[in-house]
Every structure is written in structure tokens, then in C-alpha cells.
């Protein structure tokens, strides 16, 4: 069964090693917190592209990924939203991937999108800018361990 959208905290996203089959049709993605969208993007496989941003952030190849890591551990509560351009919400755009991405950018005014974003939202002052120095230079393995611990603690608290 293919889903049309999924949203989950970054800490949970990080624990998913392979793209679930149901997510293979998701071709749009958003990095966001409760108040602001940081980035909107598109890819034939949104799951993999989000991972590219995250991994590229360590080397400065992705401003979005770098922003996530300089704001760690707070950023582990960011939401990763994956969408399908084929969803009914994009029918007025004839479910065109490029048009859907552009529409999301215009509607959500993300911080880091430049193209199609005349009114980009400023990064909230409560966050470090993407060009800030890493406060803690640690490995991806260590970050994944921290995410896993946070998820376990959250799950225990729910019970």
C-alpha cells in the first residue's frame, strides 16, 4: 500500500535505515519545526534525498543538513514530512512535481529556499545559523545513538 504523506520527528526518521516500500512514491519533502518550515525540496525518492541533506551537512554540502547538525540535539525534534505530488492536494497543479514544489515554497515560505520564495522566513533567533561552528563535532553513529536513546525515553514515557 502506497501512502500519500508521512510526517515524523527527525529522531525517528534517523532510525529508519531503508526506505519503506510504502514511501517509494513520496517525491516531496519538508524540514520543519512546530512554527516554521526550513526547507522544501523534491526528488524521485524523497527519503533518500533527506538522507543526502543530512549526510552532506557534515561536510557543508547542504545548508539544510548543516543547520540540522549545528542545532543538535534540539533539531532531533524537527519534523521530516514526505509527500506525494500525486496527492489530491496538488490536483489543482495537475499533480506536476515541479509545480507542487514551487507551490509549497510559495505557501510555506521556508527559510533556506531561495528560488520561488520572495518572502522567505527568517531563521528564528532561537536557532544557531547554518554557518555557525559545530558545538559538538561527533560522528553520525553517535548522533544515531542519541536519537535512539531519545526515542526509547519518549516511548517509555508514553506508557
Predicted regions and their residues:
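Boundary/linker segments flanking structured domains
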Residues: 1-26, 32-38, 44-159
